[in-house]
Amino acid sequence: TEQNRTEQNRTEQNRTEQNRTEQNRTDEIKLLQYVFGYAVVQLGDVATKIYRGSGITREQVTTDGISCVRYGEIYTTYGVWFDKCKSHTQISEIANPKYFEHGDILFAITGERVEDIAKSTAYVGNEKCLAGGDIVVLKHNQNPKYLAYALSTHNAQKQKSKGKIKSKVVHSSVPAISEITIPLPPLSEQERIVKILDRFDSLCNDISSGLPAEIEARKKQYEYYRDKLLSFPHCS
């Protein structure tokens, strides 16, 4: 019908306009990277897709089946990045499955502490896995470990915690995560930074069985150099 054709044309126009806007922003980021060596971007600018996971209850976790992550595990089990899921579930039990795959960033958007809310981790494994409820999945075309390291800095955590009120349960959201800003250098520089931080992270883990004071000192040293490495000129 004429109404359907009009609606279809409007949808196509909106899609074309959205693609043009995204391309303009991509070109702007590349220009800033070329001139200054990096661009300060919002996560919404680098996201190709961002969405929430779907609830997986404790009772639905099994010893086999499809790999999955529940939001609490982002706080307790996974570090800056991980390549294997701890939990599994039966896909037939999940009414509206939401998937994540290699390179995606996962955020836990419910927590108990303002200081920890929206903790994130990069998945660098090769399985297609399920994201549980209260998780936000961010897809992108950047180096996943770089984004994960940048999102673990004190500056990023301040942004995640901004405006949150202390209570028994703290929440974040897709819009709040989309507004987080990070410095974004070209992919080649992202890779160089990741290699340095991976080596440093490995050194810290090597002494994890040492004296508590030594472990704490090395952890603070790592955090200092991580934040220093990810602090670009005029970027606060």
Language model features with spans:
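A short glycine-rich beta-alpha junction/loop motif
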Residues: K128-D134, I165-P186
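Non-catalytic DNA-recognition/assembly elements of restriction-modification systems
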Residues: I29-G53, E214-K220, Y225
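A short beta-sheet element
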Residues: R70, A95-H154
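Short loop/beta submotifs within extracellular cysteine-rich repeat domains
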Residues: T1, G55, T76-G79, V114-E115, ...
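Amphipathic alpha-helical segments
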Residues: T1-Q3, Q23-T26, G37-A39, S178-K219
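Sequence-specific dsDNA recognition surfaces
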Residues: G44-T57, E73-H102
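Long, intrinsically disordered low-complexity tandem-repeat segments
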Residues: Q3-T26
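Short, solvent-exposed loop/turn positions at domain surfaces
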Residues: Y34-G37, G55, E93-I94, V124, ...
